[in-house]
């Protein structure tokens, strides 16, 4: 058994449109480069918070810009001004049919999603009548509100007051395979929201829906705010993932943030919840201080996606990237001789793009650690190459069914 592995998923941090992006309406998407260019033009200044060009010295030193240029072919920065990357760097192409969170994470852990998720049509009253009537009946509800495609923050502003007055939860969806339920934590009850989400999870299985998401909020009309008590109720992966094999082998699998939810709590030995990217980074550092040899620490940094990508907040995304970048030396300082850190993403969510949905993009693959030398790993044809490489480093008894190790 050798070292430990820490995986940091920068949720939605794409680095260039995939070759099939046009099929998804995402031709030309590039989350990183478009944020970089907006900052360069002075469009991402936040008084007292950030100003000017995007500054990611630590990610740059680990090969982010080299990987992004290889991914997109765009010469958005002079590589001659950068040092040779300190670890492995490249990019990966998604083989799963979706551009969603479960697909990206499952593929990363060795299980590409080769089936089509179910989706709800973008029209008023988008959910099947049978689904809604059964949901109302089984949950003993007076009815529901919403029933459409919507931004989560906009729909609670629109319907939050009526929700409190009537006791009807707000149900909505997006371009992803999701059934989302928003409810006020005090007026409706947080545990009650979780309870009806569990019922919804069973009801949407027949429609091949990937996730039911609890979206609690607090506050008063005009100042409603979503809380950190979100929960994802995912359908289980169709095959065993890297996490399952590690757990079966007696390893510690420490899931931080929404990782456990994404894998339907399978293959996890310890779950740690935290709200916000910086709290998630704190939790990651704490886990790395005590994680035993041969273990996996796996963190999803959801704010990039939920707070900035979907909301098309370019300046906020830039600031979040800089905050994340500034914390990396703290992680470096905790690494033991044989440890490896993998930085990746699960899909794109270009904040300069129309709409509010994910974008079909390549993801960065950056690997560093005390024993990791500089190496361009090029284009990886499947996110599962990440999982296969982790399996090799952690010396699993047999390789994963998908993916090619780049170690």
Curated annotation (Swiss-Prot):
Gene3D superfamilies documented for this protein: Alkaline Phosphatase, subunit A (3.40.720.10), Phosphopentomutase (3.30.70.1250)
GO BP, one annotated term: nucleotide metabolic process
The keyword Metal-binding is annotated on this UniProt entry: yes
Reported cofactor(s): Mn(2+)
GO cellular component, one term: cytosol
Cellular compartments annotated: Cytoplasm
EC number: 5.4.2.7
Cofactor stoichiometry and binding remark: Binds 2 manganese ions.
Protein task: Isomerase that catalyzes the conversion of deoxy-ribose 1-phosphate (dRib-1-P) and ribose 1-phosphate (Rib-1-P) to deoxy-ribose 5-phosphate (dRib-5-P) and ribose 5-phosphate (Rib-5-P), respectively.
Name of the molecule in the record: Phosphopentomutase
Gene: deoB
